[in-house]
UniProtKB/Swiss-Prot annotation:
Belongs to the acetylglutamate kinase family. ArgB subfamily. InterPro entries: AceGlu_kinase-like_sf, AcgluKinase_fam, ArgB, Asp/Glu/Uridylate_kinase, Glu/AcGlu_kinase, NAGK-C. It comes from the Bacteria. Pathway: Amino-acid biosynthesis; L-arginine biosynthesis; N(2)-acetyl-L-ornithine from L-glutamate: step 2/4. Substrate binds at residues 78-79, 100, 202. It comes from Polaromonas sp. (strain JS666 / ATCC BAA-500). GO terms for molecular function: acetylglutamate kinase activity; ATP binding. GO terms for biological process: arginine biosynthetic process via ornithine; L-arginine biosynthetic process. GO terms for cellular component: cytoplasm. The keyword Phosphoprotein does not apply. This is Acetylglutamate kinase. The keyword Amino-acid biosynthesis applies.
Length: 305
């Protein structure tokens, strides 16, 4: 009998009959067994956060992972929502090497949007889908301690950029995350750290997800983005990248802008022992389940060697 498949190009199950749906579920069983009890850190961002149908799909997928025995941890971004809030205030966003320049007023907006709006929307959707989500920032339980990021110019190492209240992670204490996992909750984390004087720092969500995956000894780090994965200059998907290949892509300018911190966070996690790191297309319905519960080669896998 021909085996039913669901691919990134054809993720819709509406045309699949009951028997084939059962077969698809059976194909997922080995992965459910393999990853039972394992931590999956998911960076949630891009269009998947702004399209209502994709928002609902994401929440359902996270709940499903929890119900079958995995431990999903969500780290979310919120760039479009921050940009919209700043525009309403008449402030124009400015980025250097993929990082948002964050003055004091912008930091207040970032904190309000991420922790007060975006995070609560995600928590509500997961709870509505049958999960038990709890929102956290870096302040909660001393989760993320940070300091001002010193950004060195990628073309001139002698030059530094002052990008304001953008943070560099000093340490992560995962105690509160582990406690929530043990009680069957799903942590939803806003990428805001706190400094020695209790000041807030805006930290790139991809970087937070990578560091958290390392500290939690996660089985997988999955980064949802607005592209099929990492693309070469011809627009072709690169399905597998090593550290050496990534260095070459940095050098020739293939990887730039917002993809820079994403790749850096992914590579850091891979080098630090996270078994599997993937950058996938969050615009595809149920993309996360396709990655975790099927054998489809999907997106870009990042390897340390």
């Amino acid at each position: 009998m021909t085996q039913p498949t669901v691919t990134a190009d054809d993720p819709d199950l509406s045309h699949v009959g009951p028997r084939d749906k059962a077969e698809i579920l059976a194909q997922a069983l080995p992965y459910i067994r393999k990853f039972h009890g394992k931590t999956m850190v998911i960076k949630y961002g891009g269009n998947a956060m702004t399209d209502p149908a994709l928002q609902a799909d994401f929440a359902e997928d996270v709940v499903l992972l929890k119900l079958v025995g995995m431990n999903p941890v969500v780290v979310h971004g919120g760039g479009p929502q921050i940009e919209a809030a700043l525009n309403r205030l008449g402030k124009k966003g400015h980025f250097i090497q993929g990082m948002r320049v964050t003055d004091e007023e912008t930091m207040e907006v970032v904190e309000w949007v991420l922790a007060g709006q975006v995070q609560q929307d995600i928590v509500g959707l997961i709870n509505q889908a049958g999960g038990k989500a709890v929102g956290l920032t870096g302040r909660d339980g001393g989760l993320i301690r940070a300091q001002k990021l010193k950004m060195v110019d990628k073309d001139d190492p002698a030059k530094e950029h002052d990008i304001g209240f953008v943070g560099d992670i000093v340490s992560i204490d995962p105690s509160v995350v582990k406690a929530l996992q043990d009680d069957a909750f799903i942590p939803v984390i806003s990428p805001i750290g706190f400094g020695e004087s209790n000041e807030s720092y805006n930290i790139n969500a991809d970087v937070v997800a990578g560091k958290l995956a390392t500290v939690l000894k996660a089985e997988k780090l999955v980064l949802l983005t607005n592209t099929p994965g990492v693309l070469n200059k011809a627009g072709e998907l690169l399905t597998d990248l090593t550290a050496r290949e990534i260095d070459d892509l940095f050098a020739d300018g293939t990887i730039s802008g917002g993809m820079l911190p994403k790749i850096e966070g992914a590579l850091d996690a891979a080098k630090s022992g996270v078994n599997s790191v993937h950058i996938i297309d969050g615009r595809v319905p149920h993309a996360m389940l396709l990655e975790i519960l099927t054998d489809q080669a999907y997106g870009t896998m990042i390897r340390s060697h």
